[in-house]
Amino acid sequence: MTTGVQFRGTVPANSSRRWFTWGWPEDWHVTWYVVPTTPEQGGPQIDWDVEVERASSDDVTYWLSIQNTTNESVQVEARYAVLN
């Protein structure tokens, strides 16, 4: 298994941001997870969703939507794991 950070970003308070990452081989089994890197105690900071576009016969594009559920900006990392 291979893991890594695809990108880092900031999501402003009470808002959403959408990123995409392209050129992933269609035969890779990729899972995504998003982790806040801004510490804050007391509850969840983000919610996220991943959508998939088959960009070509060989490549996949992933669209990551991240929602900040707090009243402060949150820095995030979009992490991936290639399972095969």
Predicted features and spans:
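Extracellular attachment/recognition segments
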Residues: 1-84
